[in-house]
């Protein structure tokens, strides 16, 4: 499948894996509840209380939760949420694009994920077709305040002009994409650091 004519080096990681984010979240929730944790969904955070430089509580739309520790898992609102505790977190939300093809003949359901860091793309199998995604170096920033506080699990408008250079790179690496029927282009917000690395 892969055009490797211009590849000078590669890494094969047969022990790597892929996790379904929704399944992982459900498993973590189940495990936490079995150990006594209480989960409050759809509960907006309005502030983080501190005392002597340490967390002592979280203010929510339903009242205050006393706690000495928090896990900042607020995605595109991470910068704003951390600021409630006086902490600067170097993340900013950007549009994140990926394309799905319709099923392709002979497509293996367990293909390894192809990451081409020089071309800022990743490709993997998805429901009999392919998923082509990108982590471009100059992402399109989003002001999270423009999305609204109830924004969750929604998509942003398509932008084929922005995705076109990534698609060209993907077709170079995987020529089968040139004739692959496109199912859809998706655009959802993700948080990124200025250098693209993890925190």
Regions found by a protein language model. Give the residues of each.
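A short alpha-helix-loop-beta-strand transition element characteristic
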Residues: 1, 88-91, 179
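Flavin (FAD/FMN) cofactor-binding and adjacent substrate-gating region
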Residues: 1-41, 47-54, 59, 127
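General beta-strand structural signal in soluble alpha/beta enzymes
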Residues: 39-41, 60, 72, 182-183
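Well-ordered beta-strand positions
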Residues: 49, 59, 66, 90, ...
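Central helical "cap/lid" subdomain
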Residues: 64-113
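Active-site lid/adjacent beta-loop-alpha segment flanking the redox-cofactor pocket in flavoenzymes
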Residues: 103-199
């Amino acid at each position: 499948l892969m055009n490797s004519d211009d590849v000078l080096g590669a890494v094969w990681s047969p022990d790597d894996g892929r996790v379904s984010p929704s399944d992982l979240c459900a498993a973590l929730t189940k495990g936490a509840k079995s150990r006594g944790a209480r989960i409050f969904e759809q509960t907006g955070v309005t502030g983080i209380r501190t005392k002597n430089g340490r967390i002592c509580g979280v203010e929510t739309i339903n009242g205050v939760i006393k706690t000495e520790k928090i896990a900042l898992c607020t995605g595109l609102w991470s910068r704003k949420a951390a600021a409630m505790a006086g902490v600067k977190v170097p993340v900013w939300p950007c549009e994140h694009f990926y394309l799905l093809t319709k099923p392709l003949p002979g497509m293996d359901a367990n293909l390894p994920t192809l990451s081409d860091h020089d071309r800022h793309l990743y490709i993997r199998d998805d429901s009999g077709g392919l998923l082509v995604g990108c982590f471009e170096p100059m992402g399109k920033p989003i002001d999270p305040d423009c999305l609204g506080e109830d924004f969750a699990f929604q998509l942003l408008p398509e932008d084929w002009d922005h995705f076109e250079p990534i698609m060209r790179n993907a077709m170079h690496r995987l020529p089968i994409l040139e004739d692959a029927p496109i199912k859809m282009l998706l655009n959802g917000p993700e948080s990124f650091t200025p250098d693209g690395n993890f925190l």
